[in-house]
């Protein structure tokens, strides 16, 4: 199972949030740490993914939407 980073970005944009807004809500002083995760440079930690989901209004039980078994490498 792989984390679908395109879905993460799409859901953030659909909710009207910029990377700066999400980073601030996650307690980071700049968007850099969040941007690195969304772009796949640094992996999301489990707690970070739960926090991200919560920011967008998803419960822990709904986080499965951010995972898929068949995300091609070039689309991650």
Residue ranges and their predicted role:
Residues 1-14:
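A short, Lys/Arg-rich alpha-helix, primarily the initiator
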Residues 16, 41-54:
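Short, basic-rich loop-to-helix N-cap that marks the start of a DNA-contacting helix
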Residues 5-6, 31, 46-49:
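Short alpha-helical elements of helix-turn-helix
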Residues 9, 20, 50:
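Residues within the helices of the helix-turn-helix
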